[in-house]
């Protein structure tokens, strides 16, 4: 028989935990996640209870792999490729592995008018230099992608040289070795840029997800199904993470 499942919170936006629903399904929901707090100081436990969920039921969601023949996830592409090709379906060969980091560059806040350019410890210009490196490094690495999606200058002001920058790093590639090399090069660039400019930095890894190649037998079934509809086959990696990775 078929079991249809709608998962909760794959993205890990509100809390620093991803794949909550699918993690529970495979018995990988970590109890310590419940004590994490969001930006408003609300714990995950409180949010779930407010939504009417029974936390004690989470362990009951676990399924046994021996009871299942396979898992298939249908998802929109979330990208431009299929639209540009005018194709309705794509066959995913692998889900990219990813690493996420929360980082900070620390310089010295100083007056924008009275601090000469050659005496500044500007955290924002260091981050700008890093951002350009991130873009070029990923561009020259096949299907790799890298993004600085969050950027903040705490207590920033129009007339103050930025003393701190908080930012995120999201790095993805179809295979783990490629992903790891990308992350290592970007962190090395961060260190090099900060040393050159006399700045300090921190970098904390918040997520690491292994690349998930599609099972060959199931991929063959998908391809047969698409062909039976008279549609052309287009094989492609999935740059976005999905619950199927679990």
Q: What are the residue ranges of the model-derived segments?
A:
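Midchain, well-structured core segments that form catalytic/ion-binding scaffolds
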Residues: 9-10, 14-16, 20-176
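Short, flexible active-site-proximal loops enriched in glycine and acidic residues
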Residues: 2-3, 15
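A structural signal for isolated positions on well-ordered beta-strands in alpha/beta enzyme cores
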Residues: 3-5, 202
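Metal-dependent amide/peptide-bond hydrolase catalytic core
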Residues: 102, 113, 124-246
């Amino acid at each position: 028989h078929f079991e249809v499942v709608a998962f909760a919170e794959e993205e890990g936006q509100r809390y620093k935990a991803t794949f909550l629903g699918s993690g529970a399904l495979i018995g990988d929901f970590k109890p310590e996640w419940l004590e994490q707090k969001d930006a408003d100081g609300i714990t995950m436990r409180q949010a779930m209870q407010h939504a009417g969920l029974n936390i004690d039921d989470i362990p009951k969601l676990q399924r046994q792999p021996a009871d299942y023949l396979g898992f298939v996830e249908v998802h929109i592409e979330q990208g431009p490729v299929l639209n540009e090709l005018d194709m309705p379906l794509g066959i995913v060969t692998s889900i990219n592995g990813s690493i996420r980091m929360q980082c900070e560059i620390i310089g010295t806040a100083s007056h924008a008018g009275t601090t000469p350019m050659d005496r500044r410890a500007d955290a924002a210009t260091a981050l700008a230099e890093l951002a350009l490196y991130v873009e070029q490094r990923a561009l020259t690495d096949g299907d790799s992608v890298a993004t600085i999606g969050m950027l903040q200058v705490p207590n920033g002001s129009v007339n103050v040289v930025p003393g701190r920058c908080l930012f995120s790093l999201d790095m993805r590639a179809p295979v783990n070795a490629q992903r790891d090399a990308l992350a290592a090069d970007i962190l090395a660039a961060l260190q090099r840029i900060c040393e050159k400019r006399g700045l300090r930095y921190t970098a904390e890894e918040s997520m690491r997800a292994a690349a998930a190649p599609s099972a060959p037998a199931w991929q063959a079934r998908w391809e047969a199904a698409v062909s039976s509809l008279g549609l052309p086959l287009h094989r492609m990696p999935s740059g976005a993470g999905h619950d199927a990775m679990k």
